[in-house]
Amino acid sequence: ELSVKTTGKAMVPILNALGYDLYLPGNWEVIYYKKAMQTLLGSLNAPKVCANMYHDLGDGKKGELIFPPYYIWNIKGVKIGFLGYTDPLVPLRQSPEYSRGIIYKGPEENLAYYVDVLRNQEQCAYVLIVSHLGLSQQLHLANREECKGVDYILGGDTHERVRKPIQCKYSKVVEPGAFGSFVGKLSLTIQNGKVISDNYELVELDADKLKADDEISALIKENEIPFEADINSIVGYSTIPLYRYFVVENPIDTMVLNALKWKVPEVDIVLSNGFRFCPPRATPDHTGNIPITDGYLYDMLPVDSTLRTGTVTGAQIKEWLEKELNNVFAK
């Protein structure tokens, strides 16, 4: 709710306080449209990378990259290269209006070129892809010859808990779960200017064991004050735990669809965006049921979209479902 009502601005000081070293725009960075994305990401202190988002010059003509394609860490004379790739299917999987003015291309279009730049021109000892493609697309990419020379794909988008790196033909692939529940930790052993070994682990962030940072907690509280009453306002109750952990069907999405069906009972099919993130809510209050706050509605549906109805054919529905299943599970 805080992000929606401030069009993302409230998140900037919080992210800067967290002290990230590098950013990659994901599929939802375009939610407030291109100009706002550039302004918001430009307000973040750390560098940004993305090698497959271009300015749209009109008539399908591709301009320059919006962000630098790569970033290099120099650690005691050893260069570690980071290449960025986001999901090229954004205009197809979300409303194309969000990403108007941006042209996306597949990573395979320039990956081999930039790997060559990092390995041979920049003399990087280790090359990683920071990715927001989703696990199946990342595995597909790691088996393509263009990925030769990439050591790891540090993946995102589908929020999978990959506890052991998946070794593909050319690269290893990992993903670190969702909503801050885990952190992926990659440790490199460097000797005589070369990386001689690596070790990856998925570190669980247990709120019962880790104390919240006082400074960041205060900053979040300060940003929430104007909207606190709305965020904490109870709008309903659930008799079952609400979560969104599974790949295909979840209690949260089922509840959302049931609500849509209740609102427009005359339609045959109801659809909702398959968000893959949302903190669970399972603790009953004094009523014995689980309270649903206004703020939690925005956790479940973090896009202030309009409910729309329309007419489609069975063939259109089948084609759309086949494309989605293929994009998510096959490619």
List each language-model region with its residue ranges.
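Solvent-exposed loop/linker segments at secondary-structure transitions
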Residues: 1, 119, 152, 187-331
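Acidic, metal/ion-coordinating pockets
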Residues: 1-207, 247, 251-259, 270
